[in-house]
Amino acid sequence: MTQWYPVSPTLWQGRDDSAEAADARRLFQTVIRSEDFAPQDWPKQIALMGFACDEGVKRNAGRPGAAGAPDALRKALANMASHNGHERLVDLGNWVAQAPDLEGAQQTLRDAVRRCLCAGMRTLVLGGGHETAFGHGAGVLDAFAQESVGIINLDAHLDLRQTERATSGTPFRQLAQLCDAQRRVFHYACFGVSRAANTRALWREATRRNVTVVEDLDCYNALAQMTQFIARVDKIYLTIDLDVLPVWEMPAVSAPAALGVPLIQILRLIEPVCRSGKLQAADLVEFNPRFDKDGAAARVAARLGWQIAHWWR
């Protein structure tokens, strides 16, 4: 059974510069921490939620540890300066999966996301392995049943694997099957894909599903493809697997990328998504604090979350 917990106030701490000026504030001073999961109380705000789960990573023979990511990322976010957009963040706590019930955890996240979106919030989820994406994406599809939903994944992997059970490598095949069941088009784009990390079978499945695929080698000239994809859909779900980054920027993941796409280029790609007015949901997944020796990788991941909230329109 997946359980919900409010976040400890000790996570949101940092340097206090308020004596300098009224607007010299950091995120730990502007994030609202809710003691209850009550999205109906926070319309037009951004629901910050953790999905503490790495059961999908374990099933996918990866390096476990991502279940500890949500709180590690909160700590990294806490001391960052608060600018426009960050005052909308409401921390709605963590959903903590109980192994081995991945499917139940995904359903719980799906329901929570749907509730947030139907209450007028938008969702920023801190995973968790990339199994987060099925629960998160399904909640978005449920909330916007009459509109076209585009899924944008920044990832070294297509995550269209076919297995008997759900894993961190299957979320977009699961979402494609959900779209089939709901008789809607599966709009999926994956940027940063490593051909060396995806088999021909996965590539063939992407072609069969009409997936927009941009390889890691081509991401430096991919803004036009991103803009075209944004224009085709009504609502957007953005998911960032941190293994899209090169290993020298992001070693703390289950499967570090030998090549990857640098952070500055990832930010350039997601800026038009965030500013489009269509983004309803975003997540950061696969961060593994066990492999982050000095906290540098957490700061890299946190900068992505910081930037999304700042640019979100």
UniProtKB/Swiss-Prot annotation:
It comes from the Bacteria. Mn(2+) 1 binds at residues 130, 155, 159, 241. Pathway: Amino-acid degradation; L-histidine degradation into L-glutamate; L-glutamate from N-formimidoyl-L-glutamate (hydrolase route): step 1/1. Keywords: Histidine metabolism, Hydrolase, Manganese, Metal-binding. Pfam families: Arginase. Binds 2 manganese ions per subunit. HAMAP family: Formimidoylglutam. PANTHER family: ARGINASE/AGMATINASE, FORMIMIDOYLGLUTAMASE. This is Formimidoylglutamase. The gene is hutG.
